[in-house]
């Protein structure tokens, strides 16, 4: 690809939002801050991924089918929700990460309104002990080759 083709691909960049992600006014405000077009699509795993039109006119992902991304963002609104994923919803959470791993996808686990400091100091609403929570998160990142972003 020459520089003009690369620019055209970048100009066509859009974020795909999973159809299971809640379609709220707050979400629309968040999407507007991204500065790129947003389109809803059924993702096999994750809450967000990307799409773009290649120089041959084809899109990276055919959104008429379930999208199987190579890179995805799994968003949690806070540590409370993340703690629930490692306790009550663990099997569902694990299945999603296993599907991603089986397809060679890199998952970025985005936990909003949080920090390692808050996690380690138990500043969340759950009876999940801070040491067990930190150990679960760390093991998860290694097991599924994921990255955690606060």
List where the protein language model places each region.
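Interdomain/boundary linker segments immediately adjacent to catalytic/signaling cores
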Residues: 1-25, 29-30, 137
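Extended, alpha-helix-rich binding/interface surfaces that flank or overlap catalytic cores
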Residues: 24-28, 37-45, 50-150
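Short Pro/Gly-enriched beta-strand edge/turn motifs at strand-loop
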Residues: 33-34
